[in-house]
Amino acid sequence: MRTLQNLSDIERRLVAELRRRIDTEFTDIEFRMTVFGSRARGDADPDSDMDVLIEVDVEHISFADKRRLRRIATDVSMASGIIVSLLVVDQGILAERGDFSVFENVREEGIAV
């Protein structure tokens, strides 16, 4: 199983800052955060983005909240120089629709944050 130690120093700092910012702004919402894609696999190019899945209970998050999440991701991207591609999904989607290729990738290569 891959862990945060598989990421580079800058990637770990990016993920830590993203998590810290989300935790700070969303104290009342529980969520899971997973890094997946080329950066999680360790085969990223210098220009590769960082794919991040956020699983939340959609009953507790509004469209405005999703916009705030994307703004945080943009801020962290600008500060780090690595583009964060954020995917916000309902917490049950992996179990229900796990056969979608993106969710297969999350299960196979994901790094929980």
Can you say where each PLM-predicted feature lies in the sequence?
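Catalytic core of pol beta-like nucleotidyltransferases
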Residues: 1-32, 40-46, 57-113
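Short beta-strand->loop micro-motif that forms the acidic, two-metal-ion catalytic signature
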Residues: 51-55
